[in-house]
A protein has these predicted regions:
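Partner-binding and oligomerization surfaces adjacent to conserved cores of proteins
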Residues: 1-244
């Protein structure tokens, strides 16, 4: 039995297949790997089985196991015009800054823009069949942190959680940056909403003259409180009856 066959057989058993069912699946793939339906006689069958039939089957089982984890994507920088354009509604949105150093979190790491995309079969075999923690780490790093060099400008970091879906952030917010086209009403509303959090700073993005760079100027939240949109009277006074 080929090493990939053994790996696939092992994974099938882990997913609930009986030994007979797993063997039948292997024999079925062997049968379909040759043009003449004779795995023993057709020498090209083993190559086709190893390169074309087994890898997607193994990949399907591995992905099913690890795709249930959540990915929280972050960036090192707020200064990228491309990211403001792509991810912040063409500079109309906001950028939230987190402090990731206060709370230990072992699953946060920088994206590797030089790593190969494919996961090595030898690592899968060592992880699944030999319980190698180092091989498991390499598989996870490739799956979650490998990205094409073309994305290097994003300076991305990823925090991996045990489940997918919207959850509360582990990291405290330290600053909010408003895009250069962000509406004044949005800025006022957010500053008023978070102004009680004195540990949060606010910045407005502006273009640098004669270049494509961006700069951030601090916003004074007290000025926004005075000059910005005021709360309606019903929220300030509640059910109080005003004199006629």
């Amino acid at each position: 039995m080929l090493s990939l066959e053994r790996l696939y057989y092992f994974l099938l058993l882990k997913t609930g297949f009986s030994e007979q069912q797993a063997q039948d699946e292997i024999f079925y793939l062997r049968y379909n790997s040759t043009a003449y339906r004779d795995y023993q006689e057709d020498v090209s069958g083993e190559k086709y089985l190893k390169e074309a039939l087994l890898p997607p089957k193994i990949n399907e089982l591995i992905v099913a196991e690890i795709q249930g984890k959540g990915v929280f994507s972050l960036s090192e920088t707020w200064k990228s015009p491309l990211m403001w354009s792509h991810y912040a509604d063409e500079h109309r949105g906001i950028c939230i800054e987190y402090n990731t150093a206060l709370i230990p979190h072992p699953n946060i790491a920088a994206v590797d823009y030089r790593s190969p995309r494919s996961i090595k079969a030898s690592d899968l075999i060592a992880w699944k069949m030999k319980a190698s923690s180092e091989a498991e780490r390499r598989v996870y790093n490739t799956y979650f942190f490998a990205k094409s060099p073309e994305w290097r400008y994003e300076k991305e970091w990823r925090d991996i959680s045990q489940s997918i879906g919207v959850t509360n952030s582990h990291f405290p917010v330290t600053a909010i940056y408003f895009g250069l086209r962000c509406a004044s009403a949005v800025i006022t509303s957010i500053v008023k909403l978070f102004n009680y959090e004195r540990d949060i700073s606010f910045f407005k993005i502006y273009p640098v003259d004669d270049s494509f760079s961006l700069k951030a100027y601090p916003i004074n939240p007290d000025e926004v409180e005075v000059c910005g949109i005021r709360l309606p009277g019903s929220m300030i006074f509640g059910d109080a009856v005003l004199p006629q």
